[in-house]
A protein has these predicted regions:
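Feature captures the catalytic ectodomains and active-site-proximal regions of enzymes
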Residues: 1-412
C-alpha cells in the first residue's frame, strides 16, 4: 500500500453543450462549482477522449477508459460488467443482456419509447416483476436476475449474437421503436419474442395496477440490449500497481471494478439518482483509503437529469456533486497528507438531446506533490468544457491520461 492516495471522481454525463436558456453557457459553466474550480486552479485541466472511434458513448466504455483500460482491447459488452457486479458468474456459452423495465407509449397504432426507466420504478417493485418473469419465462436457457430500480439482467445460453444489433432505450427517447427493436441475426427473433411475452405479463401485473392507481407510470414493457460475453482483463494491481475500491450505485461500474480487481463498496442509500447518499459515498470512500491506494467514486445523478431533459435538475445535480462529493473528498483527503485527485465525466450527455454523445470530456486534477510548482499553462481559473479545450492539453486515450494521473500530473 502506498502512503500517497489517488482519487478519481466521476459525475456521470455532466459534460454538455451551450444552452440558450443559460445565456449560451453549458450547465457546468452556469452552475456554482467552487470546489471543482479550485481543483482546476491548483493543478491542470484539459480534454480526454473517453469514447474511442467506433464505440458507442456509454458509461461502460467511459468508465473503462477513465480507469486506464482500452475498451478496444477489453470491452465485450455492457451487460457482462453488470452481471459481475451482481455476482452472476457467466459461463463460456452464456450471453448477458441488460433488461430495462420501460414505459412504451402507444399512439395512433405506433409505439414510442416514453420512459427508459419505467417511471423510475422502485427496486422493490421491480423485484416482484423479475420474479414473475423468472417463474413464467425462465429456465435453464433463459435466466432472469433482479438489479436496482429499472436495471436488470437476462442471461441466455447458447445464442448467436454475432451481428445482433441493439440500442440503449435512453438513446431513443420519444422515438418510434420499430427500427430499434433487436435485429441483425437469426437469433434476434428469440429476443423479440421474449420481449413480447414480457409485455403481455406486464399488462395485468399487480405492481403496475398499483402504480397506475397511484398516478405513476407503469413499467409496461422490457427492453433488451448491451449483450456480451465474459471479458478478460488484468487487475489494477497487475496493470498499474494499485489496490483500491470503486463506489457506485450503477451495476456496470461495479462490474468494471470487479474485473479490475478493485473492492466494490456498497453504500447504504446510494440510489443512482438525485436523492443518493452523497455523504455516505464520501465517508466510505475516505475509509477505503485507510487500507488502499486508490478509490473511484462514481455519481449517476448528473446523467439521469440529462436523460430526463431537465436543465434545472442537471444544474442541481452538478452543484450537489460539487458541494457534497468534490467538497467532501477534498476535505477528507487532508488527513492523508500527499494525494492526487482528478475529476471528469465519462461522456457527454446533452440535456437537449436526452442522450450520450462521444465528444472528448473535460478533466481537472491536482497533486499535492506538484501543485506548488510555478504557474502552469494547463491550470485554469475554473472547470468547464470551454476552458478545458482552451488549455491545449489533450489525451486521445484513457490509459495515457491514467498514467499522467499516476505521475501526479508531473509535466517534467
Amino acid at each position: 500500500m502506498n502512503k500517497h492516495k489517488y482519487v478519481i471522481l466521476c459525475p456521470d454525463g455532466m459534460a454538455d453543450t451551450p444552452l440558450s436558456e443559460l445565456g449560451g453557457k453549458t450547465p457546468l459553466e452556469y452552475a456554482k462549482t467552487p470546489n471543482m474550480d479550485s481543483v482546476a486552479a491548483r493543478g491542470v485541466t484539459g480534454l480526454m477522449k473517453t469514447i474511442p472511434d467506433g464505440c458507442l458513448p456509454g458509461s461502460d466504455i467511459g468508465s473503462m477508459s477513465i480507469l486506464g483500460y482500452d475498451p478496444l482491447n477489453y470491452y465485450t459488452g455492457r451487460s457482462p460488467l453488470e452481471a459481475a457486479s451482481m455476482g452472476v458468474e457467466l459461463g463460456k456459452d452464456d450471453v448477458a443482456f441488460r433488461l430495462n423495465l420501460v414505459n412504451i407509449l402507444e399512439k395512433n397504432g405506433k409505439k414510442y419509447m416514453h420512459d427508459y426507466s419505467g417511471g423510475h420504478i422502485t427496486t422493490e417493485e421491480a423485484k416482484q416483476i423479475i420474479e414473475t418473469f423468472r417463474k413464467e419465462l425462465g429456465g435453464d436457457r433463459f435466466r432472469f436476475y433482479p438489479g436496482v430500480s429499472y436495471r436488470h439482467l437476462l442471461v441466455v445460453k447458447n445464442i448467436d449474437i454475432n451481428g445482433l444489433q441493439t440500442v440503449a432505450p435512453h438513446d431513443i427517447p420519444d422515438l418510434q421503436i420499430d427500427e430499434y427493436i433487436p435485429h441483425g441475426t437469426a437469433s434476434s427473433s428469440e429476443i423479440v419474442e421474449i420481449m413480447k411475452k414480457a409485455e403481455k405479463i406486464l399488462e395485468n401485473h399487480e405492481v403496475n395496477k398499483k402504480r397506475i392507481a397511484a398516478g405513476k407510470l407503469p413499467a409496461n414493457s422490457i427492453w433488451l440490449w448491451g449483450q456480451g460475453y465474459k471479458p478478460s482483463m488484468p487487475t489494477m494491481k497487475e496493470a498499474y500497481g494499485l489496490e483500491g475500491s470503486v463506489i457506485s450505485a450503477v451495476d456496470l461500474v461495479k462490474g468494471i471494478g470487479k474485473y479490475a480487481g478493485l473492492k466494490v463498496i456498497d453504500v447504504p442509500g446510494a440510489t443512482g439518482y438525485l436523492d443518493t447518499n452523497y455523504a455516505g459515498k464520501v465517508e466510505y470512500g475516505m475509509k477505503s483509503l485507510n487500507g488502499g491506494d486508490f478509490v473511484y467514486i462514481h455519481v449517476e445523478a448528473t446523467d439521469e437529469a440529462s436523460h430526463e431533459g431537465k436543465i434545472d435538475l442537471k444544474l442541481k445535480a452538478i452543484e450537489d456533486f460539487d458541494k457534497f462529493i468534490a467538497g467532501g473528498v477534498l476535505e477528507g483527503l487532508k488527513k492523508f497528507g500527499d494525494y492526487t485527485v482528478m475529476i471528469l465525466p465519462d461522456h457527454y450527455n446533452q440535456v437537449k438531446l436526452k442522450k450520450h454523445t462521444p465528444e472528448p470530456v473535460p478533466f481537472c486534477g491536482f497533486s499535492t506533490k506538484t501543485e506548488k510548482q510555478a504557474a502552469d499553462k494547463y491550470s485554469s481559473v475554473n472547470y468547464s468544457e470551454t476552458l478545458a479545450q482552451n488549455s491545449g492539453l489533450f489525451f486521445d486515450s484513457g490509459s495515457k491520461l491514467f498514467k499522467y494521473f499516476l505521475n501526479d500530473f508531473n509535466r517534467q
